[in-house]
Amino acid sequence: MMKCLFLLCLCLLPIVVFSSTFTSQNLIDLPSESPVPKPVLDTNGKELNPNSSYRIISIGRGALGGDVYLGKSPNSDAPCPDGVFRYNSDVGPSGTPVRFIPLSTNIFEDQLLNIQFNIPTVKLCVSYTIWKVGNLNAHLRTMLLETGGTIGQADSSYFKIVKSSKFGYNLLYCPITRHFLCPFCRDDNFCAKVGVVIQNGKRRLALVNENPLDVLFQEV
């Protein structure tokens, strides 16, 4: 009898060991679902369309408001307007229309894209409609947004639209290769916030460490 019990235990031992090993070390990891990208919406709640034009509107009121526009940079020798500015008040003129050029077919939050002022212009000034980030401005101690970029250029012309922590959206500058050229790109994704600085009495879009510009997008 004892011999039969002993043989039975020997038969069951591999099953117990296999079961323990499988459950503790070889659990099957099911693939997790990727988050569904969220489309960026305009002021009417419609998804942004790469073929449409929009005004970038600051959410603030009074001196905190004002649309984004294309203007001449102070002391610039460029043959065309080459600066990205914000009007000094929400009761000022309407901003310059822009279009968003995504890497994919749609415009989603937290996705790389180019931004271009969508206005009639002479051939000489076509490249002066595409947004980019300039070199470090020693006087203002920041990097200013300007035009003269190239669609698809990774190091100076890529931006993202992300949800603001307050209301509306924020713009981010996100170079994807030479991060060392952007001392303001400090977050996990090597992006920098876009805000406003004062340059010669005008409000100029620039990279900031805090207080990013909260904006909405109004279809033209």
Swiss-Prot record:
Protein function: Inhibitor of cathepsin D (aspartic protease). May also inhibit trypsin and chymotrypsin (serine proteases). Protects the plant by inhibiting proteases of invading organisms.
Q: Identify the domain of life.
A: Eukaryota
Q: Which pairs of Cys residues are joined through disulfide bonds in the record? A: C80-C125, C174-C185
Can you say where in the cell this protein is located?
Vacuole
Q: Write the protein's name.
A: Aspartic protease inhibitor 5
Pinpoint the site Reactive bond for chymotrypsin: M143, L144
Endpoints of the signal sequence:
1-23
Task: Identify the propeptide residues.
Answer: 24-32
Q: Which organism is it from?
A: Solanum tuberosum
| Family to which this protein belongs | Belongs to the protease inhibitor I3 (leguminous Kunitz-type inhibitor) family.
User: Pfam families recorded for this chain?
Assistant: Kunitz_legume (PF00197)
Q: Which residues are glycosylated?
A: N51
Transmembrane ranges, per UniProt, are: none
The UniProt entry, under InterPro entries, shows: Kunitz_inhibitor_STI-like_sf, Prot_inh_Kunz-lg
